[in-house]
Structures are given as C-alpha cells and as structure tokens.
Amino acid sequence: MGDGQAGSVININGSASGQQAPTSNSPTLTRKSSSSELPPELRILCFDLTHYNQTTQFLLSCAGVFILYILYGYLQELIFTVEGFKPFGWFLTLVQFGYYIGFGLVERRLEAYRSGRRSLWNVEPAPRCIPMKTYLVLAALTLGTMGLSNSSLGYLNYPTQVIFKCCKLIPVLVGSILIQGKRYGPLDFAAASCMCIGLAWFTLADSQMTPNFNLLGVAMISGALLCDAAIGNVQEKAMKEHKAPSSEVVFYSYGLGFVYLFVIMLVTGNFFSGFAFCLEHPLQTFGYGFLFSLSGYLGIQFVLALVRSSGAPIAATVTTARKAVTIAFSFVLFSKPFTVQYLWSGLIVVLGIYLNVYSKKNKLTFADIRSRFKQFGFRLARSPSRKFLVEV
C-alpha cells in the first residue's frame, strides 16, 4: 500500500511538471493539484518522517529495523543464558506483555493528543473499534505466538528458532487455503517447498550438533508459527472491516493476553516460582526484559513505516536480511557449535523467501504454465521435420 501511494505521488508530480497549461487560473484545479502533491503521512510514534524524501525514509526505516531487532534477538538470547532461567519462558512472556500494555497506552495517548490538540494527560484515547469477542480470539493467538516462541528457546538454539520464523509462509499458505479459500500460484508453492526442505535440513543439522536438542522445542516453535499464521488472517479481516488503528490492536491483544496468562500462571502456580526467580536476578530479568520489550515494540513501528513507505515486498526482503544478520551475530556473540549444513540449508530457506517476494510482483499461475506448454508443443508440432539423406 505504501509503495502504491509513493508511486502515485511521483506520477502526479511528474505529470504536473510536464503540463503547465491546466494550472493557470482555475482555483479548483489549483486546490486539487496542491492537495494531490502532499505526500502520505509517515510517522513513527511522535516522529514525523513525511517531509523526508523516499530514500531517506527507506534508510531510516531500515536502520531502525536492523538496530532494534538485532538488539531484540541479542537480549532474548542473553536472558536465556542466565543460569536456571530456561523453565521460565512463560514468565518472560508475562513481563513482555505487561511492558507492551504500558507502551500501547502511551502510544494511544500520543495519537489522541495529536488529533485533539489538548494536554497529554487530560486527553482520552479514541473509543474501541473492533468488537471485544474478536480481541478475545486475537489475545489467545497472540499469547500462543509469543509464549511458545519465548519458551522454545529453552529447548532450541536461537538460530534454529529464527529459521523456523523465516518459514512463516508455510502455515500462512495452508491456513489461507483452508480458511479463506485463497488460490496461490506455482511460485508460492515452490517457495513453500524450498522452505520445507531448508527447514528440515537445518533442524537435522541442529539435532546432530546440539547435545541438548529436544523435539519439544520444535513442537513449541511450530505451534507459535501456526498461531502467528492465524493472527494474520484475523487481524487483516478485523482491521479492514472496522478501520481500527494498529495501536488499538496491539493494546487490546497484549492486554487481554496478559490477563489470560496471569490467570493461567496463578492457577498452575508457575507465577510465584517465576516471580521469585526474577526477584533474585532483577537486572537480568526485569531490566533486560524492559529493553527486550521496548526494542520489540519499537521494531514493529519501524516495520510498519517501512511497509508504508516502500511496500510489503521490500519490507519482507529487509526483514529477511535482518534475520540473517541476527543469526550471524548469534554465532559470533554466543558460543555454539557450527556446521556448514547450517549455511546451505539457510540459503535454501532464503531462496524460498526470495521466490515468495518475487511472486508478489509476478503473478504466474498454473494456467499460464499450461498455456506456455501448449504453445511450446504446438510450435514443435508445426516445425518441419528434418530429413537427413545419406548417399552411398
């Protein structure tokens, strides 16, 4: 959407510069041309990037994505290196959700302040747009995604977890076919196949290199991907139907998810053991957890800005490059075994991601392939047969 908006602004400006006649005396035309030349608004929290050129917007968004998500991955892995913390991945999720509630509330007040022009602390956030029953479903899916993803680090290497996250297309493709009845082209299926092959190879290499490899971690991160795939479909439908801002979706999803998880941990008794452990290591848990949550929350804002300014395919390419850099940093900063199979299987996954991005710009269908095969067969049938005469 952002790519289309940026393109329309460039085309309008170009046509206006090439045609001088219509901009003469008509106030209507003058008003239209001045309003059409306004670029689409691009904000990251309270920072306005609207009046920067598209290249500057892209570079700032890329820098934010790389810096914040590399910091996010580093802090996440660092927290799990604390001795004895691995069983408390769900408590880390509870802490993260609590911080996200505070960040979301501040962002909603900032949005209301910008629109109402009143004091920041006297302004009230906009009323809720999406029905509560939808948020109850979104909160459960968000809890499954974040909780299972965090907890899987107790059983998997961080690079393996990131590789699994790169393969989100697989459950998204299957879920949208079964739930929404969408149709996909051959490039999408080729991308999913590459991801499956690379993922299986990477997991096999990890099971051979890591002595504490546990299939429970694979099950957890797979469950997180399934929840993440369902979130995309539910969020997209709800935001289109009710015109809800992203800050509202984040606030209610994580707020209700916090309530879910808090009740579950109270009933199971895991809350008190996790809280006691974190009180013994406040800096490594609550302190690093704050920076971990803040970098993740701000990273979401930069990704959304990148989508608006450069389009979803470019954003997907940037986030994929970010994940590759994160994996490299993980091997450099944290000691872990390495094998060349990690590299080759990772490249196969990257190929799948590239095919997925390429398919967004080139809508190749199975009908196109069949028609091309028919044309090729027709040309072969019409080509004159060559006779080779051998004279003796």
UniProtKB/Swiss-Prot annotation:
Spans annotated as Disordered? 11-35
Q: Does the keyword Protein transport apply?
A: no
Alphabetic keyword roster = Developmental protein, Golgi apparatus, Membrane, Transmembrane, Transmembrane helix, Transport
Q: Mention one GO molecular function.
A: 3'-phosphoadenosine 5'-phosphosulfate transmembrane transporter activity
Q: Where in the cell is it found?
A: Golgi apparatus membrane
Q: Which family does it belong to?
A: Belongs to the nucleotide-sugar transporter family. SLC35B subfamily.
Described purpose of this protein according to its UniProt entry: Mediates the transport of adenosine 3'-phospho 5'-phosphosulfate (PAPS), from cytosol into Golgi. PAPS is a universal sulfuryl donor for sulfation events that take place in the Golgi. Essential for viability. Involved in glycosaminoglycan synthesis and the subsequent signaling. May be involved in hh and dpp signaling by controlling the sulfation of heparan sulfate (HS).
Query: What is the protein name given in its UniProt record?
Result: Adenosine 3'-phospho 5'-phosphosulfate transporter 2
| Gene encoding the protein | Papst2
